[in-house]
Each structure stands twice: as structure tokens, then as C-alpha cells.
Amino acid sequence: MKIPLNIGLIHFVGIGGIGMSGIAEVLHNLGYKIQGSDQANNTNIERLRSKGINVHIGHQAKNLGEAEVVVISTAIKKTNPEYIAAKEKHLPVVKRAEMLAELMRFRQAIAIGGTHGKTTTTSMVAALLDAGNFDPMVINGGIINAYGTNARMGNGNWMVVEADESDGTFLKLPADIVVVTNIDSEHLDHYGSFDAVRESFRQFVENVPFYGFAVMCLDHPEVQTLASRIDDRWVITYGANPQADVRFLNFSMKNKKAHFDVLIRSRKTGIQTELRDLVLPMSGKHNVSNATAAIAIAHELGISDEVIRKGLAEFGGVKRRFTQTGSWRGIDVFDDYGHHPVEIKAVLRAARESTNGQVIAIAQPHRYSRLCNLFDDFTTCFNDADTIMIAPVYAAGEEPITGFGSKELVEHIQMASHCDVRLIDDLEDVVSIVSTVAKSGDYVVFLGAGSITQWAYALPKRLAELDNNDEFSAN
């Protein structure tokens, strides 16, 4: 049975989070009574409030009010006063993934998994299904520019969701189709070992019903190995790999847009399909790979080649995924969520492919534990940047780890032979350096999952204050 509409008031603890806000918005649109709380105000909360959802700032037991159900994310600790109050009242306490799973149970669902690229791929799959008049429900881990939100109601039979592997709860999601973009060493604080991460993705794929299928990236060694071990589920492979069922080739960048072809070889029918001269208004081979996963799903669901072509060409992107925030004197400024070495490397490579100028990177390491666990990878992921600035670590509630801070990262990047890497303290340092070293045609790329996005939007305005010309533009 579906969640009864008369279940009563549903209270979200941490409602401002990107995943929680999307679920809350969809439930509200379905007619459920929703409220929530969070530690601080943000744009997600403002959007929910504009829809009539009551959101408390700060966590207090009294915030529960008349709530009959409480939804929490794994970030909510058992010492949270609202969690304690819910337990004392013997209210059902539901994890975020369980509530998402409830929404998925009564639709045909596509779950996008992988260490990197989930949000963009989810958005692309949604865009192609939308173009094909599937009218999907969507719950994403980022703001889809075309919708202005991370959630889309949709009245069709299909649902597209981002499957967050960080706490293992993605295994609860009942999907008919899954995507695995890549598998890297991440979230070891939860899993304990990389082998445990591998095993979770194996279960993710094998949870697909016999009538569904998995779409897996053959360019990633870990995913290729996993695909070879799946013998009781239908698997469609994709990537640049010549052996992929859905292969992209002839990639090039023109005017900040990716151009490529796709060759689809069906193992079921033996039919070969070519899609030539596809255009994606995004930079980077990694985004073409994500688009190829979306193409594989769309083709399998019967969406025509021309609709696929149109859907890709009109794709509006995702907020904080190589998002241009402004320009100054011909210097373009971008904001990106990349905070893992693999993501940073891919973003900087995309920037390098898109400009003939310099690439200037400003990175804010996210969590001391991640910096410690992946320290060697962080020292070598900035090779496509001409100038690197490392900001203080965004701790996200963690305590510092001796020997693994921004200062040590700068020192080791220098030891790895990068000639221009600098330790910075604040935005004013960035303004000083960029105004000195950057020239027209250069890219300035901010990287990180923390507060650095505020710098990315502030920099063009601060640079414009240095002079009184009219060359400034802000997005």
C-alpha cells in the first residue's frame, strides 16, 4: 500500500539538505503534511517555505509539534534533541533512504549510482525521459537548472533518483534500472574498507529485478570487473571503451560545447545504431560519458534518436557542476562541487579542453578524513591547473588530523613538481592573485563541497570593484 495521506504531519530533521529537501518537496506536492527543521537557513529552505512548508531554524524538541512521523538523514546524531523527543514519544523514525524507497515502490524507477557523476547523470536521464514525454518524477542530489529545483513531481509512470552510496542505504532503493558510473575509494569512514565499497555496489546491481537491467561504465576498471561478475542480470555497458555496448567516440570541444558520436550495439537483437554529431552544452569527456549512460537508458526505453539528440542539445546542466558565476576582463569564473581527487582531475581536464588560456584552480579540501585517506591522490590531481590555490579545510564538523591540512597539501603538491601552488586564507587572497596573474581567455575554477561556492559568486563582483569599466558581467 502507499503511504496513507491521513498518516499525519511528517517532520524532517535536517530538511535543508539536498536529498531531504527533494523528498519533502515531492511529498508536499503529493498532498502530505510536511514540516521540518535545520541548523541554518539556505536556498533549499527558502524554496520549501515558498511552497507553504513550515521550517524551524535550530533543533529543539518542541519543533516536532503534532508530528506523527519523523524523517532523518544519517547526518542526524542520536544526541539530536528532536531525535530524542521522537523516541520518547514512540514516533516512527524513518531514514531518508527508506522514505525515498516508499516513493519509488509504486513507479518504475531508475537509480543512478557511482562515486562520481551521479547528479549530472540523474539530470541527463531525467532530461531525456522528459523530452520523450515520459513526464518522470525526479529526486536529485543537485539543483537541475531546467527545473530550478532538485525535485520534479511528474505524473508519468517513471521515477529517476540519485542513489547516495555514502551510508549504504542506497541498497534499500527498489529500482528497475540502475546505473554505475564508477567505483572509487570513498566513504571509508562508513564502509571501513574498499572491499566493502565494492561489495555494496555488487549488491546494488544484483538487487535489480530479473526484468530490469544495469547500465555500467566500461571505462572504469572497478566497474568493468564488477560487470564481468554479474551473470544473472541484464547488463548494458557504456563508455569510450571499444568493447562497450553503447560507445561514444570522436569527442571534441567547440565553443564550450561537447561534440561526439555514439555507436549502439544491441546484444539482444544484433542491431547497430549510430547517432552522429551529437551536441552537449557542457565541457569535458566525463560529462559525455555521463550523457552516454543516459542515451543507453533512453534507447532501451524506446526513445527515438531525434528526441535523444534534441534532449541533449537542450540540456541545461546542474547547479555547481562547472557553473559559470561571472566574468571580468575576459576571465571566466566557474563554481564546481568537485571535492574528490577523481572529480577535481576531471573538472580541470574539462577546463583545459575548453580554453586556450590558463586554468587557475582554487580548492577547498572537504573533511580532514577525506584529505587524510586520499592524500597522495590530492597531491597529483591538479596537474591540469597552471596556478593552484589551496584554502583552509572545510571541516564539516570533524577535528583536524595532524599532518593532513592545507599547509601540508601545498607542500606535497610542490614536492610533486607543480611550480605554482599557494596557500591562501580568504577571498581577498584570491582577488589579489587572480587580478595579478590572470589574463583574458583564462578560466578560474573554484572546487569544493563546502563554503567555497560563496567565493565563486563573490569573486567577479570583487574583481569588478578594482576598476570602473563595463567589462564585468555576473551570472
Swiss-Prot record:
Any one Gene Ontology cellular component term annotated for this protein: cytoplasm
Identification of the protein by name: UDP-N-acetylmuramate--L-alanine ligase
Biochemical pathway: Cell wall biogenesis; peptidoglycan biosynthesis
GO biological process, one term: peptidoglycan biosynthetic process
Binding site for ATP: G114, T115, H116, G117, K118, T119, T120
Coiled coil region boundaries: none
Stated family: Belongs to the MurCDEF family.
Keywords associated with the record: ATP-binding, Cell cycle, Cell division, Cell shape, Cell wall biogenesis/degradation, Cytoplasm, Ligase, Nucleotide-binding, Peptidoglycan synthesis
InterPro entries hit by this protein: Mur-like_cat_sf, Mur_ligase_C, Mur_ligase_C_dom_sf, Mur_ligase_cen, Mur_ligase_N, MurCDEF_pg_biosynth, UDP-N-AcMur_Ala_ligase_MurC
Gene assigned in the entry: murC
